Amino acid sequence: MKVWMAILISILCWQSSAWAVCPAWSPARAQEEISRLQQQIKQWDDDYWKEGESEIEDGVYDQLSARLTQWQRCFGNEPRDAMMPPLAGTVMHPVAHTGVRKLADKNALRLWMREHNDLWVQPKVDGVAVTLVYRDGKLNKAISRGNGLKGEDWTQKVSLISAVPQTVSGPLANSTLQGEIFLKRKGHIQQQMGGINARAKVAGLMMRQGNSDTLNSLAVFVWAWPDGPHLMTDRLKDLATAGFTLTQTYTRAVKNADEVAHVRNEWWKAKLPFVTDGVVVRAAKEPESRHWLPGQAEWLVAWKYQPVAQVAEVKAIQFAVGKSGKISVVASLAPVMLDDKKVQRVNIGSVRRWQEWDIAPGDQILVSLAGQGIPRIDDVVWRGAERTKPTPPENRFNSLTCYFASDVCQEQFISRLVWLGSKQVLGLDGIGEAGWRALHQTHRFEHIFSWLLLTPEQLQNTPGIAKSKSAQLWHQFNLARQQPFTRWVMAMGIPLTRAALNASDERSWSQLLFSTEQFWQQLPGTGSGRARQVIEWKENAQIKKLGSWLAAQQITGFEP
């Protein structure tokens, strides 16, 4: 009883979280958004089931379908049936396809496993479901899943798939099998290669006419033998003897959720002969086939892989000005999980790049992780009905602006503070962008080095800075005074690499001010263009003023 109460509470919490993210739309706006996406998904369904074609990745289709269902629930509409074919077919299945309930996570699986025993895990092969009917040892009929009760007659197509046994003997001579027709792969690594739109490709091959040769790129994974042997080991042995060897190879006994997680992770990274999108855990003991009905299989569940790419809603478009004055665009997202990382922001790039992407709040974008776990945009998969884009700031900034604070300089000024505090410059541990914003908002810095004047009391009384960290921060600010001259020059934004600056052997501000363009040009990696930039930088009025201020603070190398 406690287990079922826990499951119920989990479901209620999930429902609460789903309601919490309902869009703040008027009824008219909601109707328009739902109607547009519903029509598009219907068109994709028609293409998929009638033509065997798909213009959209399987994973994107699944996530947009889930988004539509969420919107419908939010605004009191009846959710659509998940990808049910427009033409269900006329051939009755001897045994109904039940489908499989998908669990959210390992904890949900653990709760389910407590109520079942003699459990086995299989890969959730990504393809299209089929019924194989054998009578008197021969393949008598092959039926597409359809609506689970009726499907299309695929006998002629399946008879041309060489990997599907056309004759069987022994216990399978008069049997009904259920399985997945899949695209054969050599060494498919799901973690690296993703879904490759396998489901749509298989459907396309099965729907089209006159493609008998390409059918040999398909095979079948049998996952159910209704009314078969009671022992799973006997089932697997008989299937393997009949030619369905993959089922025995990829079915393992499991005792708990940890073992399932281990196998799931192994198959996620291993070379497999098919595309998968998770694992299925099933009890060996099944009801008699006459009790099987679509959507009512309590003896098996699925635990899907997290998609390599996630569809995320754009909540806002924000503009950031870097220390060099370049304007970059960032999309703020409704949170999504990617490889155990919570992603709420993604960098779009320049204003021009943002305009090329044509992204507005309310759009749905496909996000994945690039190298080093950095989120990136792969595609814009759906654009909202009402689209209002913010106006980017005027491009008035450059590498020599905003050393001193002003209202228009807010973002570039903060970027300069973040830069000078970084490890490669002054190495101010324990403070990032949020901390700098808090300090500037409270103490209204005049310029990028004003923090040197803050007292321990001022730091301790700064909202947003924990009192326990204020003393440490003051210590860091004091230590910065001992940093070498070249680090301070880097903090001032000199347009040179650290290697070039070190090679210059400049050790004082006065020496640097008197260095010529020819001197800078002979440094490693510094051409005439960069040398002119250095001259322009050191002759800038703001830079000279900062140099004088640092001299007054007796910073090493700046003293007269």
Swiss-Prot record:
The enzyme's first-digit EC class, named in words, is: ligase
Signal sequence, renumbered to the chain: none
SUPFAM superfamilies membership: DNA ligase/mRNA capping enzyme, catalytic domain, Nucleic acid-binding proteins, RuvA domain 2-like
Which InterPro entries does this UniProt record tie to the protein?
DNA_ligase_AS, DNA_ligase_B, DNA_ligase_CS, DNAligase_adenylation, DNAligase_N, NA-bd_OB-fold, NAD_dep_DNA_ligaseB, NAD_DNA_ligase_OB
Q: What functional role does this protein have?
A: Catalyzes the formation of phosphodiester linkages between 5'-phosphoryl and 3'-hydroxyl groups in double-stranded DNA using NAD as a coenzyme and as the energy source for the reaction.
Single GO MF descriptor: DNA ligase (NAD+) activity
Q: Which species is this record about?
A: Escherichia coli O6:K15:H31 (strain 536 / UPEC)
**Gene symbol?**
ligB
Name the keywords, alphabetized.
DNA damage, DNA repair, DNA replication, Ligase, NAD
This enzyme catalyses: NAD(+) + (deoxyribonucleotide)n-3'-hydroxyl + 5'-phospho-(deoxyribonucleotide)m = (deoxyribonucleotide)n+m + AMP + beta-nicotinamide D-nucleotide
The domain of life for this entry's organism is: Bacteria
Q: What is this protein called?
A: DNA ligase B
> What NCBIfam families does UniProt report for this protein, alphabetically?
PRK08097.1 (NF005987)
Enzyme Commission identifier(s): 6.5.1.2
